[in-house]
Amino acid sequence: MTDRNGFVELGSLLILVIALLLQGCGGSGSGGGTTGNPPAAPTGLTATAGAGQVSLSWTASSGATSYNVLRGTADGGPYTQVGTSTATSYMDTNVTNGTTYYYVVTAVNSWGQSGNSNQISATPVPPPPAAPTNLTATAGNGQVSLSWTASKGASSYHVKRGTANGGPYSTIASPTATNYTDSTVTNGTTYYYVVTAVNAGGESGNSNQVSATPTGSFSGVAVDVNVLANRHTISPYIYGGAFPNDTTAISDSGLTVVRWGGNASSTYNWKLFTDNADNDYYFEDFTFCGLGVYPTCSDSDSAQFIKDVKAAGSQPLMTMVMLPWVAQSPEQSIQQGSGSNNYHWVFSVSQDGACSSKVDPYNTDAGINLESDCATTMVASSAQLNRTYYPLLDDHTQTCQAGTCEYRSDWAAALSTAFGSGTCSIPYSSITSCHFYDMDNEIDIWGGTHVDVHPNPSGYDELANTYWTEATKLKTWDTQAVRLGPVSCCWWFYWNGANGNDKNAHGGVDFLPWWLNEIYWQDQIASTRSLDIFDIHAYPDGPDTSGYSQAQKQALAVSIYRDYWDPTLVSPSGTINQQYTTYIQPNKTIAFRIPRMRAIANMIYPGTPLAFTEWSAAFAGESDFSTALGDADAYGILGRERMSLSTRWTAPQAANPNYQALKLYTNYDGSHHGFAPISVSATNNGDPNLFSSYAAVSADGKTLTLMVLNKDPQNSAQVQFALSGFNPASFVSYTLVVSAPNTITASSSQPWSAIQTFAPYSATVLVVTGSLANTPSSDWDLNPDVIMVPESGTVTLQPKLTSGTANVTLSSAVFDSFEGASACGGTLTLTDPVITPSQSGTITVNAGGVPGFCHFTVTGSDGTVTQTEGGWIVVGNPPADLAVSGGNNQSGNVGTTLPEPLAVTLTPGQSGGTATGASILFTTSAGTLSNGTTSGPKVIALTNSSGVASVTLTLPGTPQTVNVQAEAPYALGHAIANFTETAQ
């Protein structure tokens, strides 16, 4: 502390003196005062929001002299100081109602400020509004109009309704305006209304009560929707088609199935990608069209077709060739020359002397099956066939006699690989990986469409045996195959086949029932199933329209699909409207096509669903708007009537209005939202020629879709909806109308209105948002809902659960009055009314004594929700009689053949059948039966001209009683005869 000269520095001396003074005053050691610290952060901060204010309070911090209140409008800050308090509370009045604020508080003293307290948020709200005043109600026809005086500060109102004076009330709407029209009322019922005002602060008390009774006679169409009636899943596979333009069209239109089919597919060569057009076009070989139509073909490779269709979000339906020939090279790629191998058409003018005046205008050497005189039929020779076709064999165990052969087994293996793995949901209620196969195409008319390779009409036996053989083999080549058959052509051939008197040679049984019966029994004998879906083509038969005006054709196009379902429609077709078309079916001149065919399938081969793999009715042209309305009607019918699969011939083209009609069901909003999946009842009192309605709900019960078709070209349709079991809130409409035929127009969302008006010539989907009034714990079905039974016959229904686990108790089953239903006179008995997850119920049906269509309704409850299901009993002619006429009550040594054949006699009676050629199925409990050709525990024997069918029985190797049962055809009433034999 000295400088270099030895003197003490003045500054250092001063510091020393100050330090000594501080030491004496307690600057160190244990005596005297302390150095201060800021207080701890407050704790326990709470906030209470009020109207225009937020009240804060917290726990005091030790040593704090005041508190700073900080506020922000975002969680976690930043914060701005809004006030100071010396107390442990603060009232923030500088706030806006409805805004959320975030607060923290800090403690302060002379030594500084603490950190933040815990954060708390609060949202100041206004006080609830006052109750509305001056509520008035004006009753109208099917509606009640309400109005009231506004409540200050209200953001919306609750309209509440009851049917008793003083309540209770249920909220039916939440409008923001001071008026509301209630269109969900029933004329003649008195309703009581109150209104409350609502804001963020809460709900007011009730307004004054008013009452109103709507009256009047509604002159429009009444549509009654019941979401707890006739509930069933709509198969997604009903929205199919053949030959869409391309994969973009598949995806955009929402096609769920794309069919590879048609006459040409019956001769498809899977290696060369070719087909023969046969009688459709001069018997020439061409490149096959998988997608698109001539001349813009693509995907002629069948395996690539499958891959492309699946990539587009759809499911392929292939056609498995059952004819014995497939095409060679396409004719357009071959130069005409003198060598016969250069001619890829069957009937050549130059080579065969075919008629020269009936030739392909683009290839004048290709003719038809007429000799040079243009009158005599030319039958194709083996040389003609061999230059145009290759033989098609089942597999390589069969010998190719000469040249090139193709093999079904190889093709099926390639198709199976293209289909890929995955499960197939049966009964086809969801889109999965199904390997769908049509077993050829319209096999009943091969003798016409493919007369070159099949010169004779197809017979009953050929059609059954060929199908059963090839369908059974296909399952070994592709174990996931779903086989559709017989892919029958049309109404006349359903019942008569194509082979002259072949029907009378088979017991007089109509072709399709005979074929189905034969396949079922063959499957029973082989312990297999060869038929997965019963498939027919279903062009609604109409009259000769050659003299019709365009307006008449349009009227027919929008009404013709009544053919599918209407029990009252006497067909305008000269084919259907004939008593001689079928001798066995009831109501012969009424098509009733879907219920009738489903009833036949359920009677003969239980569990077999129905498909239409060709349908359309474009009487006024594919591009006409009437075709779009007809198609929209058809899609609704196919879903309501429980079809399993359908493919339109051909798929709608994007340039035509019916393309948009399909999208109303599959992609109405461009985002692939479509018609809901659970069909429900939607009856109406309109003229079915001019109006149709269909309904379905979503699986969660929050969406109801309604399809409304106004098929009247001149007049709007005013419609009053009654929704049972569903509480509607709002809806959006999607409309296709003749004035904008290629555009689906969407409305804005709006409150539900029970009365709406639909433009002339329009198709509209209403997508209604709401909720089920009650959600079923279990859904159930009649199993089956349609079946055929002979006059005075008996059949059993076995209702079962389709979803849920709650037991269902059936309370009633009655034949009822239904438009078009016959006066049945039969009975329905609830033999076992309880349905459980593990056990079906039982309803015994005793048919009446009059053939016809009998409608019935069954009611059941799961303990909370009551549902109804309706169905049809198709009552046929009286059954034929089947009686034992020999070989009963015999005894013989074990292992020996009884000396007398077991014989039965079929007496047709009033059944409509004949005695000759009927199939009788014999089944033995032990031993072996033989019909002289085949043997086993089950064999089929045919009746002779006297109606007698017989088999021999070889007794089993051990002593016992042997029971043998004989069954007559189902179409003749399925009479039973029994034998009792003894092995000793």
Task: Give the residues covered by each predicted segment.
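Carbohydrate-binding surface patches
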Residues: 687-727, 764-769
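Glycan-recognition and catalytic regions of carbohydrate-active enzymes
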Residues: 624, 635-705, 740
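Pro/Thr/Ser/Gly-rich low-complexity, intrinsically disordered linker/stalk tracts
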Residues: 32-63, 97, 110-153, 187, ...
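The feature marks long extracellular or luminal low-complexity segments
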Residues: 838-840, 846-984
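C-terminal motif of bacterial Sec signal peptides marking the signal peptidase cleavage site
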Residues: 21-24
